[in-house]
Amino acid sequence: MPNSTLTLAQMLIARRSLTPDDDGCQKILVHRLAGLGFNSEAMNFGEVENLWTRKGIDGPLVCFVGHTDVVPTGPVAQWDSDPFTPTVRDGFLYGRGAADMKSSIAAFVTAIEEFVELHPDHKGSIALLITSDEEGPAVEGTVKVVETLQARGEVIDYCIVGEPTCTDRLGDTIKNGRRGSLSGNLTVKGIQGHIAYPHLARNPIHTAAPAIAELAQTVWDDGNEYFPATTWHISNIRGGTGATNVIPGEVNLLFNFRFSTASTVESLKTRVHEILDRHGLEYELVWELSGKPYLTPKGILADALSAAIREVTGVEPELSTSGGTSDGRFIADICSQVVEFGPRNATIHKINESVEVADIERLSRIYRLTLEKLLLQD
């Protein structure tokens, strides 16, 4: 049906699904897919709504991962049209979630519809994992569904995450991996005192400074063929009472690693503690792992998606691991081949978020051709 993907995208954008509120988006998808033979399960945790819906029981299983939640709009007055009234203007669809990532969800659903109509006896299975908790804490969304699937022994063979990956034109970038994210909350202890009597105090900012300098100058690894070198950066420093005559009793630092597969979580932790200990600091350090790095080398899935992109757009996609974390990091625990592909990301999270209307239908064709290459060919 002409423009069916656009119509579905508009239906989803019209829902005010601010994290963790799905606002009925998943019900739209369940209703749409029921007629194709999909069996749907609500896997809700806390305030988060998750959907696992699958057609077929045989392998291979191709899964699409997406999120219906969106970030806040910012000042509505700065939008040229209401962010939850999907508006087509000058060849673009405007609205919060247009690019990130309701158009991708719509495109995959219509791709399935056309695929099943053309190939009703296809081999394998198709599934969607949709959450309303990707833009927020991401602790009761995809990760919880993955844990549930793991517990009952379900395995995903190929996974496409619908994140907006392209930069200049549709098809130019496939994400075939992401760096890991490891954060630290470091408190260095000192002795508070009068700044005129430093011999009666111990300034933790002064004692921590050499260690901070060493951490900032350390080469953690050299990266590899797929990833740049691991980086360490401070995001926040807090210390002192606000007075100019008081030596602080402690200083607090928040820092973050973005790390490649050339390093491990434990190796990074060990090296940080070694540096802090070598400088004789009295400290407390709390770690938080947001996600491990994952990588899908060239293979069946990346090749199939790349070929589909070339057929539809004529563009040769680049495989990239740049950018922040995504829900792909959770799927990688139960799927060895995970890639991310969606529309251009130039306007995501911005005022007047938009996606080119022509790209929405092209994206659906790319997804359908990818399904054909994965589920029709031996």
Curated annotation (Swiss-Prot):
It comes from Nitrosomonas eutropha (strain DSM 101675 / C91 / Nm57). NCBIfam families: dapE_proteo, PRK13009.1. It catalyses: N-succinyl-(2S,6S)-2,6-diaminopimelate + H2O = (2S,6S)-2,6-diaminopimelate + succinate. Transmembrane segments: none annotated. This is Succinyl-diaminopimelate desuccinylase. Homodimer. Catalyzes the hydrolysis of N-succinyl-L,L-diaminopimelic acid (SDAP), forming succinate and LL-2,6-diaminopimelate (DAP), an intermediate involved in the bacterial biosynthesis of lysine and meso-diaminopimelic acid, an essential component of bacterial cell walls. Its cofactor is Zn(2+); Co(2+).
